Amino acid sequence: MSSLAQKKTARLKRQIRVRKKIRGTAERPRLNVFKTAKHIYAQLIDDTCGATLAAASTLLDEVSTGLSYTGNIEAAQKVGAAIAQKALAKEINMVVFDRNGFLYHGRIKALAEAARENGLSF
């Protein structure tokens, strides 16, 4: 198995292990983060009814305007700020952070810190 396949398998194992423990509710939804080489995505998910309450990504025009590249830390900070604003608009202050098996480093850390700076607590 190649090293890239091993990294992906290890991330998926971490994702499954954490998903067994983390549950989002309507009062405290799960802030799910996913990243690719070019984009980063964030969703607020209520696991009791399986609904997405809010979403933000670098695919949105409001986030990607002014960015030369959407796969960097600057883009992740804008996504974190956008998801925090959408959550506060729906009167959601507390979330459960789900890093989706990714290491808390780089873009994931930047998104989380930007969300905290803009009013979310986790």
Curated annotation (Swiss-Prot):
One Pfam family matching this protein: Ribosomal_L18p
Keyword Ribosomal protein (UniProt): yes
Gene3D superfamilies: 3.30.420.100
Record-linked SUPFAM superfamilies: Translational machinery components
Record keyword Cell inner membrane present: no
PANTHER family: 39S RIBOSOMAL PROTEIN L18, MITOCHONDRIAL, LARGE RIBOSOMAL SUBUNIT PROTEIN UL18M
Subunit description: Part of the 50S ribosomal subunit; part of the 5S rRNA/L5/L18/L25 subcomplex. Contacts the 5S and 23S rRNAs.
Name of the protein in its database record: Large ribosomal subunit protein uL18
